[in-house]
Amino acid sequence: MNVLRTPDERFASLPGYPFAPHYHQSAGSLRMHFLDEGRRDAPVALCLHGQPTWSYLYRKMIPAFVAAGLRVVAPDFFGFGRSDKPEDEATYTFDFHRNSIVALIEALDLKHITLVCQDWGGLIGLTIPMDMPNRFERLLVMNTTFGTGDAPLGEGFLAWRAFSNSKPDMDIAALMKRAVPSLSDGEAAAYAAPFRRRSSTSVWRRASSPMTWQRLRVF
């Protein structure tokens, strides 16, 4: 398997992101990045990002959660952030992403979890608590849905799928500025830091495929 690993210097001095990186070996030889802030014995806020973002999305929420007495674990899905990026688009199945989060929860033995999820972090993350009920206590759900795979896809989703498939070299910084005009140029560039070339972006084309949506029927 050919795997991209974004150089560490791409993540140097990102605005508002002073957190130390942590890594978990998962899915064979692949390396998943996650943030781990706060007391290790505290209840956990497990923060799952969407696309095309990464754990940088939670940079302002992490200090607030820690100040409230929580341990914050914020992984980057494979293909995003500082996590490894397999070049083969077929790798990025729904189960691949879901299983990687389950493996991280088990490896860190996370308990008393509040699932904090947004966008695809919710579509993936919301299928997990019912299989691990003794580990989860609360949900904080933002801008997402619990997909069942049997409802017609919304116009917004179809528009995003068409857009992402037609823009293999998508300008992530410009996209984020359009979505959140208040972002500084440095913050917008930070969202784009993990993605160096076209093969880095195959993950979100796969995520929005009809096959992925149909997989949600199982849950």
Give the location of each predicted region.
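Flexible "cap/lid" subdomain of the alpha/beta-hydrolase fold that forms the substrate-access gate
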Residues: 1-21, 32-39, 44, 57, ...
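Glycine-centered tight beta-turn/hairpin loop motif at sheet-sheet or coil-to-beta transitions
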Residues: 27-31
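Short hydrophobic signal-anchor/transmembrane segments that target glycosyltransferases
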Residues: 64-66
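C-terminal active-site-capping segments
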Residues: 24
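Structural cue for short, hydrophobic secondary-structure segments
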Residues: 47-50, 74
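The serine-hydrolase catalytic nucleophile loop
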Residues: 51-62
